Amino acid sequence: MTATASFRRPGVRHLCTMLVALWCATAAAQPLPAAGTAATDSGSASASAASAASAASAASAVSAASAPADDVTSHVCVADGGPSGRPSIGLALSGGGARGYAHLGVLKVLEDNRIPIDCIAGTSMGAVVGGLYASGMPAEDMQKRLSQIDLADIAFDVTERADLPQSRREDERYYINGLTLGFGAKGVKAPAGLVQGNRLQALLADWTAAVPTNQPFDRLPIPYRAVATDLQTGQMVVLDHGSLPLAIRASMAMPGLFAPAEINGRALVDGGLVSNLPVDTARRMGADVVIAVDIGSPLRPLDALASPADVMQQMVGILIRQNVTSQRKQLHAQDVLLTPDLGTIAFTDFQSANQAIAAGAAAATAALPRLKRFALSPADYAAYRSAHAQPLPPPIRITRIDIKTSGGVPKRVVSDALHVKRGDIYDPKQVSQDLLALTTGGNFESVTQQIVSRGDDNVLEINAREKYWGPNFLLFGLGMSSSSTDEGGFRLHVGYRRPWLTESGLEFRADTTIGSDLQSARVELRQPLPGAYGLYISPYAEYQRRYVNLYDDSGEVKLNQYLMQTTRTGLDFGLPIARLGDFRMGIGYVTGHGSPNYNLPIDDTSGSLFWPTFSSQALTARARLVIDQLDDPMFPRRGYFTELRVERSLWSHNSQSTQEFGDGISNTPYTEIYGKAMIAQQFGRHSVSATIEGGKSIGGTNLINAFNFTLGGFQHLAAYAADQLTGNELAYGNVTYMNQLMTFNASPIKALSVGASAEVGNVWSSGVQVGGGVLKQSYTFFTSLSTAFGPLYMGVALAPGGRRNIYLQLGRTY
């Protein structure tokens, strides 16, 4: 039994359309297998003669699966149950993505009419449905289980944001999900597929827990074969033994989108490239009668090919249709071909599952006049179902745990994540849950687990594979802003991650922002500490260069602009709080330097001094708690967020020139407190979120923290320019309503929404009573697109007094 813990490839599903086009172009550029390979010979085999070419094809395909070379026709498809001499019935299920739900409808009609299935061959989605059914799972049970999950999220490795470690959630605020490059001694690399298929394999492992590992698929309740393609040679590979979940995943690994599955040293991908309707495979298993279900997408009319991606997708569709046509020609007179009318259901349209199931049932019902001749009596069929039921797995007590790692992955990292120990009863679900922290951390290609029994020795094998496109990783993000109240700007984010520098798990992290209004850099080491709870120690250094606008007391008249440069070095101790968030505390040394951009007098009085250049230093102790359970950091529809930060200066010094700012600036120690809370609740396609935020400096004021709090910009008093209001005391509140008008499958755009928000708040300088004066208001009406590259929002914000701001922004960084 094999199970795989999951990790998130957030945003990947929204890139599906582009990747399909890439797959199409790649597949179309490959030459068809030459004569003598599995694909050509299988396609040219005659339906009435076992020619030498056909025999060579069968031998090639079977030997590719490590079966005996002389086992050209295995004859494992035996009529089991019913009257003596009845024909053995094989089921050939084609690939087609979400259209494959039609297979469930076919199976339900066959069950209702007591038509037995003696062997199954499946490709891609047909391999998924066929493999589960072959393991003994009834069609009704399969439909119920599939209806309780989001198969699209599972297939595309989408993990709930709340299940990610806090470091990954923080990265999401700056970097594009799924856009990660690796580099090493051999140069820059990218993953062979954006989706590793871990969640799907884990789900299949859970649902097939009764199936022993590394056994022939002939021993399943129904003999089974999965068809895949060797990525290197283009040959058809018929998988007939080993890990059932891995065989299924290999059969549906669409090149470019899903990473190849490695089996016996071969990189295997979607079998639809060579045999999307595996009639010949079912025949070689010994089926006397083949029920073939073709769910392939029809070719599109010429006027529907509106883009290069459409043309490339049509190209690969033609190639797949050719191998399907070849397989259909191998059907005999007694065979039955079903072609459900699936209309425009796309291969990614998992939301149309019920429609696809109904189409499959309708096609099978229409063919009942030909199918009923194979029906068994009620008594015979009851005996057949009993013999082919999914067995309950016996309890297995773990006698040994064997951890295998690749690359620079320390075994300690894996062992620390496991709570299971020798002598425990094996529970694949629990082990997968233990490994969740590893796979969702983003540093692994896969973490698989299986139990291998040899007599009384039951070994739990864990295989943790480092991402082969590492060990160094680059992350990228982009933010752009344009509005009617300021100049607009951009921010480009580049991150670097290097895990496992040492056997103890030391990680190096670096983040850089280059923007029109902000430049920053941060480097950090994270060293896990021995023991439980995930404690770590983190020395760091950071630099920030930003522009701060200074306004008069009304917040309307711009007086000057300061270039602020700050550096901070420090040492933190960190503690992850389960999957809720993170707590850090430590000590740091901060320096700051400010210089005015404009050589102007401070006021209009005669002899007034000019705005000064200043410098400040401070030694501080800081603690920060973050709890983040939002489903999206910018447009949350459900969840909650809390941040609490306290910083105390142990020593503080300002340069003499800071006296020009008045008596509020001093070398007296200060304490800065900041808090933010947000909650979001979803009601169908509607959602409401509320935010409160506040901050205050107590004691002296160092110019390093004099401009820490800002308001202005989208969702932060949107009627005002970005960071227009600056001070060291803050109060702010926000209520936002959103209506998700539509969602998109397999598109760079995830959702289209409209919304409105009401905001109130202000900032104050030191010594001014918080809440004194007028609280500024802003009312925003916006349209938002949630995209693979970050949120895109446009709208208008209004405020009393005729103030308004029209804006267009991309990214989460403004």
Annotate each predicted stretch with a short phrase.
Residues 14-27:
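Bacterial N-terminal signal peptides
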Residues 428-434, 443-624, 710-711, 715, ...:
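Gram-negative/organellar outer-membrane beta-barrel architecture
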Residues 440, 446-448, 459-461, 473-483, ...:
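C-terminal outer-membrane beta-barrel translocator/porin domains of Gram-negative envelope proteins
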Residues 300-302, 372-389, 589-590, 639-642, ...:
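Acidic/histidine-enriched alpha-helical segments
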Residues 29-49, 60-121, 131-436, 440-447, ...:
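Patatin-like phospholipase
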Residues 122, 126:
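Gly/Ala-rich beta-loop-alpha elbow adjacent to hydrolase catalytic centers
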Residues 138, 147, 229-232, 242-244, ...:
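Solvent-exposed coil/turn segments that connect beta secondary-structure elements
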Residues 1-11:
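N-terminal secretory signal peptides that target proteins for export/translocation
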